[in-house]
Regions:
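Ligand-site clamp/hinge motif
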Residues: 229-276
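Gly/Pro-rich hinge or "lid" segments in bacterial periplasmic/extracellular proteins
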Residues: 163, 169-239, 243, 253
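Alpha-helical secondary-structure segments
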Residues: 112-114, 118, 162-166, 242-243, ...
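Aromatic- and charge-enriched surface segment that lines or borders ligand/interaction sites
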Residues: 83-132, 166, 303
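Ligand/substrate-recognition segments at binding pockets and active sites
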Residues: 220, 364, 371-443, 513
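Structural transition elements
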Residues: 333-373, 394-396
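Detector for C-terminal structural segments
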Residues: 316-346, 393-403, 430-540
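N-terminal lobe/hinge region of extracytoplasmic solute-binding protein
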Residues: 39-90
Length: 540
């Protein structure tokens, strides 16, 4: 997730969207001709976008909820709840959205401007647990509200009437419309929020959906659920599937087997499973705008409060070996926190990640020297490190790779790999109970600042406790330089250089997903940035 900042006006949202088309046929039961079988690799933590934010949740919300716009082919904005693409006024600081009057929730209630106000106020409140309140920065008073200095009612968003929403910004954000496709900005049924209170979104019966489908059968803990068409959806005539069935599948071999048995129409695979299927005609590679990395815990009582130890780990990991021999799914080595091909620096016309990659990304001799130096500075002869991952097979494999390299090459190092379910790993990490955490950041936008924001000292997702006034200053300047291309990208380069120097995160690889896809499946939008859209899917 997932997910998820400020952008330059010229950014391209959801760049590289691919429309999937069919070429041949899988055998399916006639009764299943309008049922789409899908998998997710992790648990849903909640359907409340103000309370949680992870990749599975956002994938589900993409099919069942809509904001002002949808992302179409090649990332083009398509009016959804809004009737048109809004042009700002007041020198770029005011957006007035007119909502379509035929938009309705799955329970029949009309979608109103107040539903957006309800959602955004809940998401910016200091009690929000999604970790995404920072994404509202730039909307009037959002930062002060999240810091507990102002009430949520002071947020710069107002329902002028039942179908008109006004948003006031603190400074011009020419990319603001592009943010409206994110699940963080989706509305919430005000009546349901009032009715269920803290239990809103804790199961599928406690949430209403305003998108093409509605979620059914999710109890809050189960690993299989379905989505059926929202009969009140304004574009119901273009929804062809009668049902989507989703299940959690964390193992690639299991995913492959289910695909072979026609129990999955889209199976994500990795590792040796993917390696053995590279010539399969149903295999599709999707490069995503995200990097898997090690989040280092910089707290004072932790070993990685020492910068030399962090740099030692960075230089000890052969990312090409990891990508080719462990992952084998098309993922590529990454030496920077920003994914390759995510964004081009327009002032240099170079790929940002490429131009900012350190000159050395693997040097075992130097790594050992830095490790010994760091251990001496800490006054220790040995150290035990806790590496927390989720319990997907691929995460376990990467964790074991890191464990092997660190224990084999660093004197006195022992690594405990804890591979636990997403809910457990999320809790351990948010509580600071880790030394290293294998995690993914999938950019919300095709711009480096989408990645950089979560490492600012005030960001609720900065679980590694990185605190750099210089880094914070670069991000603050970038937000206000949105209309000054040269200044903005200099801020971006400065921020990445600080990460290269401080190493609060150890980048590993740019995410590439390998999918086995039913060749009869068509109408799916796969995005390099953002969630896959199955709402207009059909079988040919």
């Amino acid at each position: 997730m997932k997910m998820k900042g400020m952008l330059l006006a010229s950014l391209t949202l959801l760049s590289g969207a691919v429309m999937l088309t069919a070429c041949s046929a899988n055998q399916r039961k006639a009764s299943d001709s309008k049922t789409l079988y899908l998998m997710q690799t992790g648990d849903i933590l909640s359907l409340d976008n103000s309370n949680q934010a992870n990749l599975t949740q956002w994938n589900v919300l993409e099919q069942s909820m809509e904001g002002m716009y949808r992302a179409g082919k090649n990332g083009k904005l398509i009016p959804a709840m809004a009737t048109s693409i809004v042009k700002p006024t007041n020198s770029g600081r005011t957006y007035t959205y007119h909502l379509r009057k035929n938009a309705r929730w799955s329970n029949g209630d009309p979608v109103t401007a107040q539903d957006f106000v309800t959602s955004w106020r809940r998401s910016t409140a200091p009690t929000s647990k999604s970790g995404y309140n920072y994404i509202f920065t730039g909307i009037k008073n959002a930062e002060q509200i999240s810091a507990g200095k102002m009430p949520p009612s002071s947020l710069g968003v107002r329902a002028l009437d039942r179908h008109t929403l006004r948003v006031d910004l603190e400074y011009a954000m020419p990319y603001f419309n592009k943010m409206m496709v994110m699940p963080a900005f989706f509305p919430q049924n005000t009546g349901y929020v009032k009715k269920f209170g803290d239990k809103y979104g804790t199961n599928s019966a406690r949430v209403a959906c305003n998108g093409a489908f509605k979620v059914q059968g999710w109890t809050g803990t189960n690993d299989k659920w379905s989505l059926t068409p929202n009969t009140h959806y304004y574009d119901r005539k273009n929804i062809r599937m009668d049902k989507m069935v989703m299940q959690i599948v964390k193992d690639s071999n299991t995913a492959h087997q289910l695909f072979q048995e026609n129990k999955l129409d889209d199976a994500q695979i990795t590792g040796t499973t993917a390696q053995g299927l590279q010539k399969n005609k149903n295999l599709m590679h999707l490069t995503r705008g995200g990097v898997y990395y090690l989040r280092m815990n910089l707290a004072e009582n932790r070993a990685f409060s020492n910068k030399n130890l962090r740099h030692a780990v960075y230089l000890a990991l052969d990312r090409n070996e990891l990508a080719k021999k462990v992952l084998s799914d098309g993922s590529t080595a990454s030496g920077t926190y920003v994914a390759r091909k995510l964004a081009t620096d327009p002032t240099t016309e170079r790929d940002f990640a490429t131009e900012m990659t350190p000159s050395e990304t693997f040097n075992m001799k130097k790594a050992k020297e830095l490790w010994n130096k760091g251990m001496k500075e800490l006054g220790k002869s040995s150290v035990t490190l806790d590496l927390v991952t989720d319990d997907q097979t691929v995460s376990k494999n990467v964790g074991q790779f890191v464990q092997s390299k660190v224990e084999t090459n660093f004197k006195g190092a022992k690594v405990n790999v804890e591979s636990v379910p997403s809910k457990s790993s999320s809790g351990k990490v948010s509580n600071g109970d880790f030394d290293m955490n294998l995690t993914l950041w999938l950019a919300d936008f095709a711009n480096p600042v989408s990645d950089f924001d979560i490492l600012s000292s005030s960001n609720p997702q900065n679980y590694g406790k990185y605190n750099s006034p210089s880094y914070d200053s670069q991000l603050s300047q970038a937000r206000r330089n949105g209309n000054d291309e040269k200044a903005f990208w200099q801020n971006m380069r400065n921020a990445q250089q600080l990460l290269n120097d401080d190493m609060p995160v150890v980048p590993l690889y740019t995410m590439t997903e390998s999918h086995l896809v039913n060749p009869k499946l068509s109408g799916v939008l796969y995005h390099s940035v953002g969630e896959t859209d199955y709402t207009r899917a059909y079988f040919k």
